[in-house]
Swiss-Prot record:
GO biological process: lipoate biosynthetic process
Subcellular location: Mitochondrion
InterPro entries according to UniProt: Aldolase_TIM, Elp3/MiaA/NifB-like_rSAM, LIAS_N, Lipoyl_synth, rSAM
Record's protein name: Lipoyl synthase, mitochondrial
Domain Radical SAM core: 140-362
GO MF annotations in UniProt: 4 iron, 4 sulfur cluster binding; lipoate synthase activity; metal ion binding
Species whose genome carries this gene: Leishmania major
Top EC category: transferase
Pathway per the UniProt entry: Protein modification; protein lipoylation via endogenous pathway; protein N(6)-(lipoyl)lysine from octanoyl-[acyl-carrier-protein]: step 2/2
KW Metal-binding (keyword) present: yes
Required co-factors: [4Fe-4S] cluster
Other comments on record: This protein may be expected to contain an N-terminal transit peptide but none has been predicted.
Gene Ontology CC annotation, any one: kinetoplast
SMART domains in UniProt: Elp3
Amino acid sequence: MCPTAVPSRVSPVAAAAAADIAGSSESTVSLVADVDKKNSQYKQIFLERFRKKLQSDKTGMNNLESFVELPEGVAPSAASIGPIKRGSEPLPPWIKLKVPKGMTHRPRFNRIRRSMREKNLSTVCEEAKCPNIGECWGGSDEEGTATATIMVMGSHCTRGCRFCSVLTSRRPPPLDPEEPEKVAAAVHEMGVDYIVMTMVDRDDLPDGGASHVCCCIHTIKKKNPELMLEALVGDFHGDLKLVEQLAVTPLSVYAHNIECVERITPRVRDRRASYRQSLQTLEHVTKWTNGNMLTKSSIMLGLGEEEAEVRQTLRDLRTAGVSAVTLGQYLQPSHTRLKVSRYAHPKEFEMWEKEAMDMGFLYCASGPMVRSSYRAGEYYIKNILKQRQSAEGGKAAAAATAVNAGTAIA
């Protein structure tokens, strides 16, 4: 039936109303079509003008290539290096996850995983869903150094940072008194010369688990005396006496992550952690050990920070005496965690690495896939530690010579 056709039993008034409605609908459709046509014309005009503007631009800063490569003579900045992409969009091409290779390619990967399973130990590599697990566990190349980050005091954390995928619990299971021996044995079986040991926060324990961590460190070093050991630890409620207990253990590197810039810390980290408390922890380690302990921290990008804030965070860490720093891209581990605000371009990470080294950091690893323990045992940082050990050995030898000379004179 035609839309304007009206049954004979309908009154003339109703028929007239129906005709008006039909006419109105047709005019509305016509109006929408006219608007769409005009919008399309305006769009074409805008695109033509925009293309002409790009062609006539002499600065080199307003073309698409400038998002990837900066024009010569233009200083890099976080804003000029690359576009912002939000978490709901596809990952940019520079975010690539490395799939772990099999036994024939990375026998160390399987050996580390098997050792962890047999001793019922946790690794932050697995619990935090680190994208670099294949590279670190298997070594960065055929001759690379395999590195694993063992997580002590269980797999449940008492804090609930909004970026972290580690399980949380107000009342985690009790500590395993055999864990120090298990960890030491696992490290020995791995056959590595550098290991990272981290911890879950245990606010349910009076000392935050500091004594247990110290026991693990001493046991590991006793069974593996030549091992270089990095401990990535919490803030222990801000209790500096507990920090001192760890600082005097035979550690090679004392690491504590500041995580993000100060402004967004309250919405990113658990309320019991704070930016200033983390800085105080790192600074106290440096002062307590007279600068002899190498300290390290890490910053995530992509949480809503500004360029000036990242720069200030680097300055704050350096002022606190931190010697090594890592910067990496935050990736949302699950839909319940914070969303990514942007994906920083690799050029931006290169910029931060240069600025960090210019500020006086001894070591900086900066890249989209870098994490706090990423390639922790790589050559450069190991070389720093060996140089420090040699210097300390030289001082000890000189002191012994002076004592012997004094005895001979007496």
